[in-house]
Amino acid sequence: MKQVMFYCRSGFEKECAGEIQDKATQLEVFGFPRLKSNTGYVLFECYQEGDADKLIQQIKFNELIFARQMFAVATELSDLPTEDRISPILNALSSVEGVPHCGDIRIETPDTNEAKELLKFCRKFTVPLRQALRGKQMLTARDTDRIPVMHVCFIEPGHCYVGYSYTNNNSKFFMGIPRLKFPSDSPSRSTLKLEEAFHVFIPRDEWDTRLASGMWAVDLGACPGGWTYQLVKRSMFVHAIDNGMMAQSLMDTGQVKHHMVDGFKFEPQRKNVTWIVCDMIEKPARVAHLMGEWLIKGWAKEALFNLKLPMKGRYDEVLQDIENLKEFLNKNGFKYKLQAKHLYHDREEITVHIQAITNISPH
């Protein structure tokens, strides 16, 4: 196997390809990306047989910013007959060496309006294909996340890529996208960005301790309160920093203190803040440096913030801003865990999470 499929946001194929090329080169896996604008995916072509499996094991998925999912491609099928799409898939898989026994199957599409029209078909196709694969002992009799998951990605009717990913190094979400419902009482749709970030960056079994009731948080650029809403919903107390007006529904909870000051000038009087979150429309380098200052001063233990991207040179901007931030933290002797992701609910921005290492459980 020599191909790896990466899903990404439509319009960000170039950034995804650049990132994958860099990661592959670091691992001494040589090849090149194939991409078309606005298709929502990138195919990386390895020169050496077997390197696809090496890539999906050795690239750390949680360190990828622009890729939503990745899987090694076992076979590509086009012009599948409408009367029997299953047999060609079974025959193709049985002729490929090295395809592991899988514990689940996801029949997906790239995240574009055109491809998503196939999702209804994908849902209908899942049960019969799953049964056929189980009949051939290619899938376990019952779903399990202990072994690889099989992916079938339809990029157009009758044209799909079939492969697999490792459950300890992939996105656990269908199509790499958490399915979240907009809460009708939230003052802004931006609330979904912070909710998705919690799902992506914070393990679910740590929510009770790291997103705990009674914690204090600071929300820079808070108005009208989309991000504050997520914190209040988790029974936190929030310093909302913005010169604009906050939603009255949030103020009525008694959990929010509104400070009408510049987000770059606010300093918490008491150093009891766990979370600093920030979705200000500012130059990304300036926001990144501000978040670094909050952490090294001990004003917060975890930071979650957006970096707005320029129209051109987006990948280079991301690399530079994150490298500068790491250098600043390292120079000040700050130990941390950093992760960045272009989330589904992000647009021309990425979301960065930093956790002070003193706040990380050793278990």
From Swiss-Prot:
Transferase keyword on record: yes
Catalysed reaction(s)?
A: cytidine(2498) in 23S rRNA + S-adenosyl-L-methionine = 2'-O-methylcytidine(2498) in 23S rRNA + S-adenosyl-L-homocysteine + H(+)
Q: Which GO terms describe its biological process?
A: methylation; rRNA processing
Give the record's keywords alphabetically.
Answer: Cytoplasm, Methyltransferase, rRNA processing, S-adenosyl-L-methionine, Transferase
Q: Which residues of this UniProt protein bind S-adenosyl-L-methionine?
A: 190, 223-226, 242, 262, 279
Give a Gene Ontology cellular component term annotated to this protein: cytoplasm
Which cysteines share a disulfide bond? none
Check the record and name the SUPFAM superfamilies matching this protein: S-adenosyl-L-methionine-dependent methyltransferases
Family indicated by similarity:
Belongs to the class I-like SAM-binding methyltransferase superfamily. RNA methyltransferase RlmE family. RlmM subfamily.
Identify the PANTHER family for this entry: RIBOSOMAL RNA LARGE SUBUNIT METHYLTRANSFERASE M (PTHR37524), RIBOSOMAL RNA METHYLTRANSFERASE FTSJ DOMAIN-CONTAINING PROTEIN (PTHR37524:SF2)
Name-wise, this protein is Ribosomal RNA large subunit methyltransferase M
Biological source species: Aliivibrio salmonicida (strain LFI1238)
What gene is behind this protein? rlmM
